[in-house]
Amino acid sequence: MAVTDPIGDLITRIRNAQMRRKDKTSTPGSRLRASVLEVLRSEGYIRGFTATDHGNGRTEFEIELKYFDGVPVIREIARVSKPGRRVYASVKNLPRVANGLGIAVVSTPQGVMADHEARDKNVGGEVLCTVF
């Protein structure tokens, strides 16, 4: 069955795995998912991820989740821009998550990046999700 919202699916898989205190979870691979996971890894919200090629052009990512004293590092992760309602923000209107303690993952013409990086590069885009 086709997934209509791949980022929403990725977020749900991460949230569900952390509620069950899993060390790892897997998700189908795509370039957009890889970019979002790379932002989460570089910001310290996940330990990392590995890509596995299953042939026929199908890849799968295995995500290593991160915990601190048994508590998930990601307290809250939420989808902002959805297939039915896209949310775009200029550089001036990029959201500040938890008063700067969290991040917003933004898809810009220069690639997928965290909100603070988009502000540094003076570029806006589609707000994919927020993480705290």
Curated annotation (Swiss-Prot):
Show the GO MF annotations.
Answer: rRNA binding; structural constituent of ribosome
Q: Is Ribosomal protein one of the keywords?
A: yes
A GO CC term attached to the entry: ribonucleoprotein complex
GO BP annotations, alphabetical order: translation
Alphabetized Pfam families for the sequence: Ribosomal_S8 (PF00410)
Fetch the InterPro entries from UniProt.
Answer: Ribosomal_uS8, Ribosomal_uS8_CS, Ribosomal_uS8_sf
Q: Which UniProt keywords apply?
A: Ribonucleoprotein, Ribosomal protein, RNA-binding, rRNA-binding
Give yes or no: UniProt keyword NADP. no
Task performed by this protein: One of the primary rRNA binding proteins, it binds directly to 16S rRNA central domain where it helps coordinate assembly of the platform of the 30S subunit.
Summarize the subunit comment. Part of the 30S ribosomal subunit. Contacts proteins S5 and S12.
- Family assignment from sequence similarity: Belongs to the universal ribosomal protein uS8 family.
Q: Which PANTHER family match?
A: 40S RIBOSOMAL PROTEIN S15A
> What is the official name of this protein in its record?
Small ribosomal subunit protein uS8
Organism field = Xanthobacter autotrophicus (strain ATCC BAA-1158 / Py2)
